Amino acid sequence: MYKHASSPRRRWIRLLFSTAAISAVAAAPFPASALASDDIVQFSVIPGSLDFGASPGLPGISTLVLNGQAQTISSRVANFEVSDASGTGLGWSISVSGDDGPGKSPVLKQYCPALECGDHAGPGYVADGSTLPANSLTLDSNGATFMPVHGSTGLRPAHQCNAGCFVDAPPLSPTKVVAAASGTGMGTFRTSGFSSSSLRLAAPDSTRRLQTGELYRVDLSWTLNSGP
């Protein structure tokens, strides 16, 4: 039986149809897929310390010229700095008092800074030497403030002696001069704005003269405490 062979034109049409079908399948969009990956960021904390960056230090006071009257002479308190890197947020405070440790005097007392001063041997306090009473030195922080430094942004501590505080207080009754309440004082803060009369010495009319080269001197103890 004679079979009619496919004409070249029919084969070409079938081939063209097959190619178009494959192209259509290849061009059809497939559903998009997304890959998710979980991640975390974490760090630990090592606490630092509560410390003075620059310790408090009262300046020297000019020479007192006796005139038979009670006198007050003044000087400017040097700035100091506190750094709280403890991370507790408990706050802190600074207190000061006279220091009665060995070789020290908690009140202004006659002192020889040289090997000898007249008939007194030195250096050191003169045994049974003249003294001024406790509470002769006043710190006045009126107008002073604390400035954050080194990028600190925490709440500032507060001065406590805007009406004046005695810094040569008895050792058992220290005077609080600065307080940072709970949640404040975190970071580093430096004092600013002490006036030229922020330290005052009250010298009574009974102040005794000293031998050549001698001074009145007092030892003070500044304490930085955790908690306000």
Model-inferred region functions:
Residues H4-A20:
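Bacterial N-terminal signal peptides that target proteins for export
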Residues P8, S23-A26, R217, S221:
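Long hydrophobic alpha-helices with heptad-repeat/coiled-coil character
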Residues R9-R10, R14, A26-A27, P133:
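Generic hydrophobic-segment detector
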Residues R10-W12, S33-A36:
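N-terminal prepro-regions of secreted/extracellular proteins
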Residues V25-A34:
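C-terminal segment of classical bacterial N-terminal signal peptides
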Residues L35-P228:
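Signature of Gram-negative chaperone-usher
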